[in-house]
UniProtKB/Swiss-Prot annotation:
PROSITE patterns per UniProt: RIBOSOMAL_L22 (PS00464)
Gene it is expressed from: rpl22
Protein name (Swiss-Prot/TrEMBL): Large ribosomal subunit protein uL22c
Pfam family, one: Ribosomal_L22
Main localization category: plastid
Amino acid sequence: MIKKRKKNPYEASASGFYISMSAHKARRIIDQIRGRSYEETLMILELMPYRACYPIFKLVYSAAANASHNMGLNEASLVISKAEVNEGATMKKFKPRARGRSYLIKRQTCHISIVLEDISYEEYEEDFLRRI
């Protein structure tokens, strides 16, 4: 039996599927931003010179937009609580070569999911539990 995970009301997420880049290259960026604040993450992603930064930047921005629009959370108090990269399907193409031959070209894809959490809620909850 598969148990459903309870959704935290102070978490917002965004996922990107079949992004055409290697999962290894995307993980290199995700490891740098995991656990950081939303504003710090945007600055890091804008300044890093890798091609993988742009789709990750769009996902972080989208998750923050989901948090502010759908849940009414403040963007200044958001932290990346969970960020993961999984391998997607591999697209296979044939490149024509000399004498009627062909070489196989594999195009890697990956799935990226980012979860932002409101840290002001955690501070409020800790204070509440101390009072009890």
